[in-house]
Amino acid sequence: MKYWIGLIASVVIGAQVQAQSDPYSAAVFYPSCLAAGNIVQGKHPAADSPEATNQLRQAAICFGAITAIMNVESYFKPEFAVCPPADTKVTLAQMVLAVTARLKNYPEQRQDNFYRLAVAALAEAWPCSK
């Protein structure tokens, strides 16, 4: 009997460990970036509603992650640098939309690291001349 209990417990524990997702995968950030994309496009519920609070709370994760990326962008390798045209400034809203579009258009990459995908999306949107 102890054998069966131990066997079942190990299977259940193993399944739970395997079911946990990578906290840095793009799949984890995807709902947050969708919410952020909706906010920057003006698609949001009434300002005083619980839905608006939930949307903002969820979007804050994506806004924060992209802001963090841009704060360290100057340390990136040249192939990951972001180079907007000289006379323009890229806004956080534009960056959110670029990253969200990448996540929407390449669902097969959502299991990959969010930060790598976001950096690649930004470098693709605003490439540097070689």
Spell out what each predicted region is.
Residues 13-22:
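Sec/Tat signal peptide C-region and signal peptidase I cleavage site
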Residues 84, 92, 97-109, 124:
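Acidic, glycine-rich flexible loop segments
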Residues 108-130:
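C-terminal partner/receptor-binding element of secreted or periplasmic proteins
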